[in-house]
Amino acid sequence: MVGGGAIGCESGYFFASEWGAQVDILEMRDDVCKDSGMSQRMALIPRMKKAGMGTYCSVQVQEITDNGVKYLDKDGVEQFDQADLVLYCCGSRSNDDEVKALEGVCPHFVVTGDGKRARTVKEATYEGFCAAMDIL
């Protein structure tokens, strides 16, 4: 898994615990799950360890190849993590093409969630709830 945020960690845990896959997380920040709440981190990280997942933090991915990932470890030493499959779970941004296409279609138009900016499911759901309450 390239990316150790909530999505990368949760997806990796699923593959490790349900399918028995050997999962390594490569994260550029100094820890995994930093975009998760404390209770989620306290529940998920021990389960990730129990499932045998490897976590490599403070790394810089250099290249994704046909058989794995080249990266620089926290000391700047080039490493290679062999993998049959690499999931890229990082760097999200808003895609506003659909928002632009819908502008002017109706008199009152509210943009929420990832249409506005990339965010977590929790944040997007709350924003959608607030927009719905404004209608009422």
Regions found by a protein language model. Name each.
Residues 1-2, 25:
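Hydrophobic Val/Ile/Leu positions in short beta-strands of Rossmann-like dinucleotide-binding domains
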Residues 2-4, 90, 112-114:
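Short glycine-rich loop/turn motifs that provide flexible caps or phosphate-binding loops at active sites
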Residues 7-15, 31-41, 103-104, 109-136:
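A conserved FAD-binding loop/helix module that cradles the flavin
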Residues 9, 17-101:
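A Rossmann-like FAD-binding core segment of flavoenzymes
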